[in-house]
Amino acid sequence: MAKYVGPKLKLSRRENTDLFLKSGIRSIDSKCQFDHAPGQHSIRKSRLSDYGVQLREKQKVKRMYGILENQFANYYRKSASMKGNTGEILLQLLESRLDNVVYRMGFGSTRAESRQLVSHKSIIVNDCIVNIASYQVVPNTVIQVYKKSHNQSRIYAALEIAEQQRESVPWIEVDSAKLKGIFKRRPERSELSANINEHLIVELYSK
């Protein structure tokens, strides 16, 4: 599948917020001038149209989870077909992706690194190796690092970063010593980032 391979900080600058695309070892504030868009002579416009605001919100969430347009649109269509709040369901589907759950458990320092762990067959889901990053994790699923991958120092470095810098996620339980965790349930909207306005995304796709 195609993926973005350009500068990650450029994406955060474009969306005017930290998309958590870097490991978090050092703050990106000194590198990212959030009051300016990317480009040597860029000037951030003071006001966007309603469509522009909606589009930027969609782009921000896409880039945060590392998903391209077609796949993101599929997630929206699926969430719209399900009973309940479309925006909240959309975020729950994104949070239930295997690469994101691995990231939330702290086994990868970024979602991109977590996706790599999955694609390299380093992750076991309910006693079976799964190498599909978009695999939808259901409640009460046990996820662990494959024993042959226990010698990867980056996993322990990621766990240390997660323990020091990330907020706790109550829908996930992790045993760092065993490199194992349980996805207990899907998160409630109140437990997810307040920096996401999913209603704008719903408005955009509803046009």
Curated annotation (Swiss-Prot):
InterPro entries in the cross-refs: Ribosomal_uS4 (IPR022801), Ribosomal_uS4_bac-type (IPR005709), Ribosomal_uS4_CS (IPR018079), Ribosomal_uS4_N (IPR001912), S4_RNA-bd (IPR002942), S4_RNA-bd_sf (IPR036986)
Subunit structure: Part of the 30S ribosomal subunit. Contacts protein S5. The interaction surface between S4 and S5 is involved in control of translational fidelity.
GO cellular component, one term: small ribosomal subunit
Cited PANTHER family: 30S 40S RIBOSOMAL PROTEIN (PTHR11831), SMALL RIBOSOMAL SUBUNIT PROTEIN US4M (PTHR11831:SF4)
Gene responsible for this protein: rpsD
BP terms from Gene Ontology: ribosomal small subunit biogenesis; translation
Superkingdom of the source species: Bacteria
Domain S4 RNA-binding residues, every copy: 96-156
Alphabetical UniProt keywords: Ribonucleoprotein, Ribosomal protein, RNA-binding, rRNA-binding
Name of the molecule in the record: Small ribosomal subunit protein uS4
Stored SUPFAM superfamilies: Alpha-L RNA-binding motif
Pfam family, one: Ribosomal_S4
Function: One of the primary rRNA binding proteins, it binds directly to 16S rRNA where it nucleates assembly of the body of the 30S subunit. With S5 and S12 plays an important role in translational accuracy.
Single Gene Ontology MF annotation: rRNA binding
Signal peptide (residue range): none
UniProt similarity note: Belongs to the universal ribosomal protein uS4 family.
